[in-house]
Structure formats: structure tokens, C-alpha cells
Swiss-Prot record:
It is found in: Virion; Host nucleus. Late in virus-infected cells, may be cleaved from a 56-kDa protein to a 53-kDa protein by a cellular caspase. This cleavage might be a marker for the onset of apoptosis in infected cells or have a specific function in virus host interaction. The gene is NP. Encapsidates the negative strand viral RNA, protecting it from nucleases. The encapsidated genomic RNA is termed the ribonucleoprotein (RNP) and serves as template for transcription and replication. The RNP needs to be localized in the host nucleus to start an infectious cycle, but is too large to diffuse through the nuclear pore complex. NP comprises at least 2 nuclear localization signals that are responsible for the active RNP import into the nucleus through cellular importin alpha/beta pathway. This is Nucleoprotein. Belongs to the influenza viruses nucleoprotein family. GO terms for molecular function: RNA binding; structural molecule activity. It comes from Influenza A virus (strain A/Whale/Maine/328/1984 H13N2). The keyword Nucleotide-binding does not apply. The lineage of its organism: Viruses, Riboviria, Orthornavirae, Negarnaviricota, Polyploviricotina. InterPro entries: Flu_NP.
Length: 498
């Protein structure tokens, strides 16, 4: 991308920092995850969790959600202004699982939000450490991406369920900042914009007055974020049209859906970061590892290293397969829900199955599930190789718009070519070519028709041995190209319900 120089790296977004050199970035990301680790250790002490209980991913998620809730200012303000019976707006809580007499028992804990904020700040040198909070949100978002399909949400906004590979980050909260925006897929941004436009169509005051001005600024900012994800001039020009519209309506919705479809071939640039559960950072800090001094990166070898020697447990329901549960969490840890399964399998060193073949439900356990029958097992989160995370859509060369990988949003910068049925995708474009964006539409469709499935993306990029931390010897894997490796295709995964 030509504008690369004007962009901050992921890590700078992640840590809210201004321009820094590589070492400063590694140190500030290290400071961020070290703070998460220190916070987690302190919470385990507060809740009197044993070592094994502290390594339980369900407990980690509860603790993460509690601190996120404590810092959710908008919602806290809302709760205080709209008190509901039997609910203390100043407290937050969730299920903590403890081992009693060879069984897991659930205990609901309630915690003072003020107290949680104090513990969090104390672990982060007295700062609010928003970057660490965003990091936890992205981990939760990656877990949702690997666990649920968003078919219903896609259909509701008039999009096609086949666009599920564009939906990365669709459950991220609004307050997730620049780091959150970087990991949102094209479909997620389109969906947010369509929802906004629909509100404007139904509510006359949406764009009016002082509030409307703020709404308009938010709308244009979202348009610019989406524009920045596209890599061809025509797609960007169409985004300018959508952004500049006097009062956005159905024409804009049509344009956005068209753009989302086009992103199946002319892929957007979406960032990928390996965000791990808080307990993993906690374990490392507890063992004496100094993240800030050693430095850390979310897109290099570090997360793989960390997972190589972390033991994390999960509660397993009676008919779930522990290996499948491990795969789900592995994918979430590396933000690989939309990666080609062949690439993931090669890196992981064991076969990664499509969602529909996994005997596992989500990681979290509902309050009405019976704990009597639950077991726990160790999650296998290790990998055979590591690879650099990418933010390109896997387009072969930026000079001429060429195909990215369809139904896949690459996570790892690893050479592969892209088996796709252009006919199936082009069938989605039998829409109306009229309207004021017709010339751009024609141009986009032409680029899509000219894209060659046999093109290789990430040429010469490979995976690395775990001993090769400087990434000196790339191993370029060869894949069986007969089947396209999409995780959600032909699937019956549960829907994500808020």
C-alpha cells in the first residue's frame, strides 16, 4: 500500500503511542501485556484462586469481562441513570469456577467496580491503560469470531451469508479505538454503516441538531476507516461517494453491499493480532518473565512462544471433544477464524477442521448448565511452526488489482494460491449497474473478472521453525489445492446472540 508511511503500525495503535522505533514498540506492547498479567495475578489473590483455578480459561474470561465492565463508562452512566431492581450499578460480577471434592463448582462473585479499577490501575503503574483493555476486547472478539457465525446478522442488514469471511471483529464494542478499527473486517464496517443509515432513514432527527452533527462526524469517520481497508482506487472512490452523500439512504446501502461483495475478490486490508487470555500473561509474569524488558510483539513469534509453554485448562461439557475445544481456542488466540484451514493446519502441525465438524460449543458456560456433569482438560495450544501475521488481504500484487482469497481473510503471511470459482462470485453481481457510481462499479467488476485464481499471494513468504526467532529461513509450504479451506463453509455453527 502506497500510504504505508502515513500509517502507524498495529502495535502503535494497540498502545496508543505516537511514532516509535521497533524497540520502543516492543517495550510498550510488553508493558501492556505485562500489566494484564500483573492484574490477573492480583485478581487470583483477591478471589483466592488456586493455581489450577487460575489457569482455567473460563475464570480468565470472567475476570476479563469484569474489568471491561468496570471501565465501560457509557454503560455505567446509563445504569446509574436507569436503575433496575435488584441490580447494583456500582458492582459487576460473573461465574468463578472452583475445584471442590473432585468436581467443578460454580460460584457467582460480585465485585465493586471502583475496586476493580483500582486494582487494574495499580497493576498498570497507576494509569488507565486503555490499550490493555482494548487488547482484552480483541481477544474476546477473536474468540467470538472462531465460535459463532453471523449469518443472521448478515441477512438482517441485507447482506449475503456467504460474506461471513468479511465479518472479523463484528462483536467488538464501539469503544475499542484505533486498535479495534484495525482488526474489523470489511463486512463488519459495512454492517455498522448500514445500521447507521437505516436509523437515519427511520428517525428524522438522527442527522439533525447538535447530536446529529456528532453522528455525522462518526459516520464520516467510519467511512474513512472502511475506505482505508480497500486497496483499489475504484473501491476507494466509491467510498468517497458514500461518505459525501448529503443524506444517506438506500442508494448508499446498495453501494456498500456492492463493495462488500467486491471485497470477496478484491480483498480489504484487515489487521490480525494474536491476543491471548489474561491468564496466559499472568502465568508468564508469575514465573518471573519481564515483558517490558524483553519486549513483545502481537504479530511475530512471541505469542507462539508464550503458548508453547503455558498450560491452560478448560471446562468440557459431557459430549464435547477436548481436541476440538483446543482448536477453537487456538484459532481465537491467533485470530485465525477466517484463515485458510490448510495454512492453519500446516502451522499448527495438526489438522484444523471446519467449524461444522467440531464437537464443541462456546467456551463460556451458561448459568443454567449443570456443573455436576462437567469435566476439565488441558487445552493444546502449541504449534509446529510460527508465521508473521498479515494485514494484507492476500492480494498478489498491489499494482494491478488481483484476487485475494475468497471466503478467507488471510491471517498469516504465507504463500498460497487461491482456488476460487469466479463464476459463483460474479453471479452475485447481477445487480443494477446504473446510478451515480456506475463507472466505478463497472471498473470494479472488470477488475474482478480479470483476477486470476491461479495467482499466488504472499509470494515467497513462509512459516518458520520455533527456534528461528529472527525469521531467517522461511519454509514455503505446498498445499493440496483441491479444496478451498474455509472454516465456516457448509456450516451449522451457533449464531452469536448478544
Amino acid at each position: 500500500m502506497a500510504s504505508q508511511g502515513t500509517k502507524r503500525s498495529y502495535e502503535q495503535m494497540e498502545t496508543g503511542g505516537e511514532r516509535q522505533n521497533a524497540n520502543e514498540i516492543r517495550a510498550s506492547v510488553g508493558r501492556m501485556v505485562g500489566g494484564i498479567g500483573r492484574f490477573y495475578i492480583q485478581m487470583c489473590t483477591e478471589l483466592k484462586l488456586s493455581d489450577n483455578e487460575g489457569r482455567l480459561i473460563q475464570n480468565s474470561i470472567t475476570i476479563e469481562r469484569m474489568v471491561l465492565s468496570a471501565f465501560d463508562e457509557r454503560r455505567n452512566k446509563y445504569l446509574e441513570e436507569h436503575p433496575s431492581t435488584g441490580r447494583d450499578p456500582k458492582k459487576t460480577g460473573g461465574p468463578i469456577y472452583r475445584r471442590r471434592d473432585g468436581k467443578w463448582v460454580r460460584e457467582l462473585v460480585l465485585y465493586d467496580k471502583e475496586e476493580l479499577r483500582r486494582i487494574w490501575r495499580q497493576a498498570n503503574n497507576g494509569e488507565d491503560a486503555t490499550a490493555g483493555l482494548t487488547h482484552l476486547m480483541i481477544w474476546h472478539s477473536n474468540l467470538n469470531d472462531a465460535t459463532y457465525q453471523r449469518t443472521r446478522a448478515l441477512v438482517r442488514t441485507g447482506m449475503d451469508p456467504r460474506m461471513c469471511s468479511l465479518m472479523q471483529g463484528s462483536t467488538l464494542p464501539r469503544r475499542s479505538g484505533a486498535a479495534g478499527a484495525a482488526v474489523k473486517g470489511v463486512g463488519t464496517m459495512v454492517m455498522e454503516l448500514i445500521r447507521m443509515i437505516k436509523r437515519g432513514v427511520n428517525d428524522r432527527n438522527f442527522w439533525r441538531g447538535e447530536n446529529g452533527r456528532r453522528t455525522r462526524i462518526a459516520y464520516e469517520r467510519m467511512c474513512n476507516i472502511l475506505k482505508g481497508k480497500f486497496q483499489t482506487a475504484a473501491q476507494r472512490a466509491m467510498m468517497d461517494q458514500v461518505r459525501e452523500s448529503r443524506n444517506p439512504g438506500n442508494a448508499e446501502i446498495e453501494d456498500l453491499i456492492f463493495l462488500a461483495r467486491s471485497a470477496l475478490i478484491l480483498r480489504g486490508a484487515v489487521a490480525h493480532k494474536s491476543c491471548l487470555p489474561a491468564c496466559v500473561y499472568g502465568l508468564a509474569v508469575a514465573s518471573g518473565y519481564d515483558f517490558e524488558r524483553e519486549g513483545y510483539s502481537l504479530v511475530g513469534i512471541d505469542p507462539f512462544r508464550l503458548l508453547q509453554n503455558s498450560q491452560v485448562f478448560s471446562i468440557i461439557r459431557p459430549n464435547e471433544n477436548p481436541a476440538h475445544k483446543s482448536q477453537l481456542v487456538w484459532m481465537a488466540c491467533h485470530s485465525a477464524a477466517f484463515e485458510d484451514l490448510r495454512v492453519s493446519s500446516f502451522i499448527r502441525g495438526t489438522r484444523v477442521l471446519p467449524r461444522g465438524q467440531l464437537s464443541t460449543r462456546g467456551v463460556q458456560i451458561a448459568s443454567n448448565e449443570n456443573m455436576e456433569t462437567m469435566n476439565s482438560s488441558t487445552l493444546e495450544l502449541r504449534s509446529r511452526y510460527w508465521a508473521i501475521r498479515t494485514r494484507s488481504g492476500g492480494n498478489t500484487n498491489q499494482q494491478r488489482a488481483s484476487a485475494g482469497q475468497v471466503s478467507v481473510q488471510p491471517t498469516f503471511s504465507v504463500q498460497r494460491n487461491l482456488p476460487f470459482e469466479r463464476a459463483t462470485i460474479m453471479a452475485a453481481f447481477t445487480g443494477n449497474p446504473e446510478g451515480r457510481t456506475s463507472d466505478m462499479r463497472t471498473e470494479i467488476i472488470r477488475m474482478m473478472e480479470n483476477s486470476r485464481p491461479e495467482d499466488v499471494s504472499f509470494q515467497g513468504r513462509g512459516v518458520f521453525e520455533l527456534s528461528d526467532e529472527k525469521a531467517t529461513n522461511p519454509i514455503v509450504p505446498s498445499f493440496d489445492m483441491s479444496n478451498e479451506g474455509s472454516y465456516f463453509f457448509g456450516d451449522n455453527a451457533e449464531e452469536y446472540d448478544n
